[in-house]
Protein backbone atom coordinates (compact mmCIF):
# COMPACT_ATOMS: atom_id res chain seq x y z
CA UNK A 1 0.00 0.00 0.00
CA UNK A 2 0.96 3.65 -0.42
CA UNK A 3 -0.09 6.65 1.65
CA UNK A 4 -1.20 10.19 0.89
CA UNK A 5 -1.96 12.44 3.86
CA UNK A 6 -3.45 15.93 3.86
CA UNK A 7 -3.62 18.25 6.86
CA UNK A 8 -5.49 21.53 6.79
CA UNK A 9 -4.94 24.41 9.19
CA UNK A 10 -8.52 25.72 9.23
CA UNK A 11 -7.66 28.88 11.18
CA UNK A 12 -4.94 29.87 8.73
CA UNK A 13 -7.20 28.93 5.82
CA UNK A 14 -9.96 31.17 7.17
CA UNK A 15 -7.50 34.05 7.62
CA UNK A 16 -6.08 33.67 4.14
CA UNK A 17 -9.31 32.99 2.24
CA UNK A 18 -12.32 34.93 3.49
CA UNK A 19 -14.69 32.85 1.39
CA UNK A 20 -14.07 29.10 1.39
CA UNK A 21 -14.22 27.56 -2.03
CA UNK A 22 -14.86 24.13 -0.51
CA UNK A 23 -15.94 22.60 2.74
CA UNK A 24 -12.53 21.84 4.37
CA UNK A 25 -13.27 18.10 4.37
CA UNK A 26 -14.11 18.21 0.65
CA UNK A 27 -11.03 20.34 -0.08
CA UNK A 28 -8.87 17.69 1.58
CA UNK A 29 -10.66 14.99 -0.43
CA UNK A 30 -9.87 16.86 -3.67
CA UNK A 31 -6.17 17.16 -2.78
CA UNK A 32 -5.97 13.50 -1.69
CA UNK A 33 -7.65 12.24 -4.84
CA UNK A 34 -5.47 14.50 -7.05
CA UNK A 35 -2.29 13.04 -5.56
CA UNK A 36 -3.66 9.51 -5.79
CA UNK A 37 -4.69 9.92 -9.44
CA UNK A 38 -1.32 11.45 -10.37
CA UNK A 39 0.47 8.56 -8.67
CA UNK A 40 -1.74 5.90 -10.27
CA UNK A 41 -1.27 7.42 -13.73
CA UNK A 42 2.51 7.68 -13.24
CA UNK A 43 2.62 3.96 -12.40
CA UNK A 44 0.13 3.02 -15.14
CA UNK A 45 -2.20 1.54 -12.53
CA UNK A 46 -5.84 1.86 -11.51
CA UNK A 47 -7.37 2.11 -8.06
CA UNK A 48 -10.43 2.84 -6.02
CA UNK A 49 -11.36 5.46 -3.40
CA UNK A 50 -13.12 4.64 -0.14
CA UNK A 51 -13.99 6.82 2.85
CA UNK A 52 -15.29 6.06 6.30
CA UNK A 53 -18.93 6.98 6.83
CA UNK A 54 -19.70 10.16 8.75
CA UNK A 55 -23.47 9.89 8.54
CA UNK A 56 -26.29 10.24 6.02
CA UNK A 57 -26.16 13.88 4.91
CA UNK A 58 -22.36 14.17 5.22
CA UNK A 59 -21.86 10.96 3.22
CA UNK A 60 -24.17 12.20 0.45
CA UNK A 61 -22.34 15.54 0.25
CA UNK A 62 -18.94 13.83 0.13
CA UNK A 63 -20.11 11.45 -2.61
CA UNK A 64 -21.44 14.41 -4.59
CA UNK A 65 -18.12 16.22 -4.16
CA UNK A 66 -16.24 13.14 -5.40
CA UNK A 67 -18.58 12.85 -8.41
CA UNK A 68 -17.85 16.48 -9.33
CA UNK A 69 -14.11 15.79 -9.13
CA UNK A 70 -14.50 12.75 -11.37
CA UNK A 71 -16.68 14.55 -13.93
CA UNK A 72 -15.09 18.02 -13.93
CA UNK A 73 -11.52 17.41 -12.80
CA UNK A 74 -9.66 20.01 -10.78
CA UNK A 75 -7.59 23.09 -11.54
CA UNK A 76 -4.64 20.74 -12.13
CA UNK A 77 -6.10 17.46 -13.41
CA UNK A 78 -8.38 16.88 -16.39
CA UNK A 79 -11.43 14.62 -15.93
CA UNK A 80 -9.94 12.08 -18.36
CA UNK A 81 -7.07 11.46 -15.94
CA UNK A 82 -9.58 10.57 -13.22
CA UNK A 83 -11.30 8.19 -15.62
CA UNK A 84 -8.02 6.45 -16.51
CA UNK A 85 -6.90 6.03 -12.92
CA UNK A 86 -10.06 5.25 -10.97
CA UNK A 87 -12.06 2.06 -11.29
CA UNK A 88 -15.29 3.73 -10.20
CA UNK A 89 -16.82 7.15 -10.69
CA UNK A 90 -18.48 6.80 -7.29
CA UNK A 91 -16.92 7.15 -3.87
CA UNK A 92 -17.35 4.07 -1.72
CA UNK A 93 -18.38 4.93 1.84
CA UNK A 94 -18.32 2.24 4.53
CA UNK A 95 -19.22 2.37 8.23
CA UNK A 96 -16.45 1.95 10.81
CA UNK A 97 -18.03 -1.23 12.18
CA UNK A 98 -17.34 -3.00 8.83
CA UNK A 99 -13.66 -3.06 9.87
CA UNK A 100 -12.33 -2.47 6.35
CA UNK A 101 -8.56 -3.07 6.49
CA UNK A 102 -7.60 0.04 4.51
CA UNK A 103 -9.79 2.27 6.67
CA UNK A 104 -8.35 0.73 9.84
CA UNK A 105 -4.80 1.40 8.59
CA UNK A 106 -5.81 4.99 7.77
CA UNK A 107 -7.12 5.41 11.33
CA UNK A 108 -3.87 4.04 12.79
CA UNK A 109 -1.50 6.24 10.80
CA UNK A 110 -3.49 9.50 10.66
CA UNK A 111 -2.59 10.71 14.15
CA UNK A 112 1.19 10.01 13.95
CA UNK A 113 1.32 11.79 10.57
CA UNK A 114 -0.64 14.76 11.92
CA UNK A 115 1.58 15.02 15.02
CA UNK A 116 4.75 14.80 12.95
CA UNK A 117 3.54 17.40 10.45
CA UNK A 118 2.36 19.85 13.11
CA UNK A 119 5.50 19.27 15.15
CA UNK A 120 7.71 19.97 12.17
CA UNK A 121 5.73 22.72 10.46
CA UNK A 122 4.41 24.53 13.52
CA UNK A 123 7.54 23.83 15.57
CA UNK A 124 5.67 22.37 18.53
CA UNK A 125 7.06 19.72 20.80
CA UNK A 126 4.03 17.43 20.59
CA UNK A 127 5.66 14.32 19.15
CA UNK A 128 5.79 10.93 20.81
CA UNK A 129 8.19 8.02 20.36
CA UNK A 130 5.67 5.53 18.96
CA UNK A 131 4.19 8.07 16.56
CA UNK A 132 7.64 9.13 15.40
CA UNK A 133 8.56 5.50 14.66
CA UNK A 134 5.32 4.98 12.73
CA UNK A 135 6.03 8.15 10.76
CA UNK A 136 9.61 7.07 9.98
CA UNK A 137 8.37 3.76 8.54
CA UNK A 138 5.80 5.60 6.43
CA UNK A 139 8.39 8.10 5.24
CA UNK A 140 10.84 5.37 4.21
CA UNK A 141 8.52 3.25 2.12
CA UNK A 142 4.83 4.11 2.22
CA UNK A 143 4.33 7.81 1.49
CA UNK A 144 3.89 8.59 -2.20
CA UNK A 145 6.88 10.36 -3.70
CA UNK A 146 6.92 12.81 -6.59
CA UNK A 147 8.98 12.46 -9.77
CA UNK A 148 12.13 13.70 -8.02
CA UNK A 149 11.58 11.59 -4.90
CA UNK A 150 10.02 14.40 -2.85
CA UNK A 151 7.36 13.56 -0.26
CA UNK A 152 6.24 17.13 0.50
CA UNK A 153 3.38 18.07 -1.77
CA UNK A 154 2.85 14.45 -2.83
CA UNK A 155 2.57 11.96 0.02
CA UNK A 156 2.24 14.79 2.53
CA UNK A 157 0.33 17.96 1.85
CA UNK A 158 -0.09 20.81 4.34
CA UNK A 159 -2.91 23.17 3.43
CA UNK A 160 -3.16 26.67 4.84
What is the predicted role of each segment?
Residues 1-160:
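Phosphate-ester processing/binding pockets and catalytic centers
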Amino acid sequence: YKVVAVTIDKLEHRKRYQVWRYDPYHYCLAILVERYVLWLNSKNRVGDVMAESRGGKEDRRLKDSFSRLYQQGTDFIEPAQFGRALTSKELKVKPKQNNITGLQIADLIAHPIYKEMTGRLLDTNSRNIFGTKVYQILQESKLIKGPRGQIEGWGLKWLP
